[in-house]
Amino acid sequence: MSPKTETKASVGFKAGVKDYRLTYYTPEYQTKDTDILAAFRVTPQPGVPPEEAGAAVAAESSTGTWTTVWTDGLTSLDRYKGRCYDIEPVPGEESQFIAYVAYPLDLFEEGSVTNLFTSIVGNVFGFKALRALRLEDLRIPPSYSKTFQGPPHGIQVERDKLNKYGRPLLGCTIKPKLGLSAKNYGRAVYECLRGGLDFTKDDENVNSQPFMRWRDRFVFCAEALNKAQAETGEIKGHYLNATAGTCEEMMKRAIFARELGVPIVMHDYLTGGFTANTSLAHYCRDNGLLLHIHRAMHAVIDRQRNHGMHFRVLAKALRMSGGDHIHAGTVVGKLEGERDVTLGFVDLLRDDFIEKDRSRGIYFTQDWVSMPGVLPVASGGIHVWHMPALTEIFGDDSVLQFGGGTLGHPWGNAPGAVANRVAVEACVQARNEGRDLAREGNEVIREAAKWSPELAAACEVWKEIKFEFETIDYL
């Protein structure tokens, strides 16, 4: 370690304020396999040098504070401090750069996303010397990821539980999202599952409101999926949202879902919090429940290019905290999602080993070792004409979820489900026969519609529907 950056008690205490870069900017540092690495997009205030801003991020997210303190001499800062070890400019942005920071593993509690984020994305994001700060990516070493349980079950176990292979799974969010009685809600669930969907879903807003208390909804939905299973011979599921105002209430709802014998529950992991989510994920593994995760509130955190946190970081955090599904955008629907960026974090959710690839926004090679993968869920403004693109973009290990694209069918809920099931089966068959879905997708749908009146009606209704807006977050 360079003498310039070494801190020893024998040097003696000198009160006052000194530049962060004297202690926390260490370009000669060689990162360790056990370090947690972070890539920050930094926009410093005018007059603040990049090295000082990067060092300030490292300091304020680890051991530093605004002034020298005498208790620095009672510990080894060289062992515990974060280090800004590299800085690179952001192409096309004169006032921005990427600061790379290495954190020693001992700074973080084992198995706690809450503690990890409290440091790395804590008070440093309000630091006055920075105009804006965004966490673009994290490298989680196996020595830390192995302290987490991760997803309750993972992709392969879920397929085995459902006995469904070789195609994307199909879902539907029940609409209107608020206002239905529990019995009418259960009726919609039954019709969608009976029509051919694998899952239906509580909207993230649905908890336990006066128009539909949670226990009534759970009972009617369980009745609906049992009836649909008996009639179709397929295993069905409904994402019963266990999110609640307290952890105790959340667990009470999850326990009741297990007693009903349903296969899957749901949690809003950002509004509910990582501590609650991890607790629920542990319960789900111990009790055989799959766990669907909704990302409500994510755009507040990740949508701005210059400040906040990229969704790929939230995706990694969810994989550690625990979830078998997570919403991941659609690329083609109504919600934000650029193709290369989306495919980058989809790989981070599903794969065991992901190479660094800046063209897809992946700043670090990530090795998840044996941690199970998470199914990405494509949901938001999608319909049957999107099916070829969704099948081509997301592949088999995904959930394609059509809310309005099922319930908005002119003939009703069950025909809407039939249309989606026929469309996905046609796309998978065409792909397996070697056809190019990106080029021939519309023709594949038209051919299938000739022998499926439900699909033909859906194609006619949504033939002009598009969501063509420029993506805000891009590489």
UniProtKB/Swiss-Prot annotation:
Residues found modified as N6-carboxylysine: 201
Enzyme class: lyase
Residues modified as N-acetylproline: 3
Site residues (Transition state stabilizer), renumbered to this chain: 334
Catalysed reaction equations from the record: 2 (2R)-3-phosphoglycerate + 2 H(+) = D-ribulose 1,5-bisphosphate + CO2 + H2O; D-ribulose 1,5-bisphosphate + O2 = 2-phosphoglycolate + (2R)-3-phosphoglycerate + 2 H(+)
EC number(s) given by UniProt: 4.1.1.39
Keyword tRNA-binding found: no
GO MF, one example: magnesium ion binding
InterPro entries on file: RuBisCO, RuBisCo_large_chain_AS, RuBisCO_lsu_C, RuBisCO_lsu_C_sf, RuBisCO_lsu_fd_N, RuBisCO_lsu_N_sf, RuBisCO_lsuI
Propeptide position ranges: 1-2
Domain of life of the native organism: Eukaryota
Subcellular locations according to the entry: Plastid, Chloroplast
Post-translational modification: The disulfide bond which can form in the large chain dimeric partners within the hexadecamer appears to be associated with oxidative stress and protein turnover.
Binding site for substrate: 123, 173, 177, 295, 327, 379
Gene3D superfamilies: Ribulose bisphosphate carboxylase, large subunit, C-terminal domain, RuBisCO large subunit, N-terminal domain
Keywords: Acetylation, Calvin cycle, Carbon dioxide fixation, Chloroplast, Disulfide bond, Lyase, Magnesium, Metal-binding, Methylation, Monooxygenase, Oxidoreductase, Photorespiration, Photosynthesis, Plastid
Residues at the catalytic site: 175, 294
UniProt xrefs under Pfam families: RuBisCO_large, RuBisCO_large_N
Free-text remark on how the cofactor is bound: Binds 1 Mg(2+) ion per subunit.
Residues involved in Mg(2+) binding: 201, 203-204
Biological function: RuBisCO catalyzes two reactions: the carboxylation of D-ribulose 1,5-bisphosphate, the primary event in carbon dioxide fixation, as well as the oxidative fragmentation of the pentose substrate in the photorespiration process. Both reactions occur simultaneously and in competition at the same active site.
Assembly and oligomerization: Heterohexadecamer of 8 large chains and 8 small chains; disulfide-linked. The disulfide link is formed within the large subunit homodimers.
Further comment found in the protein's record: The basic functional RuBisCO is composed of a large chain homodimer in a 'head-to-tail' conformation. In form I RuBisCO this homodimer is arranged in a barrel-like tetramer with the small subunits forming a tetrameric 'cap' on each end of the 'barrel'.
Stated name of the protein: Ribulose bisphosphate carboxylase large chain
Organism: Keteleeria davidiana (David's keteleeria)
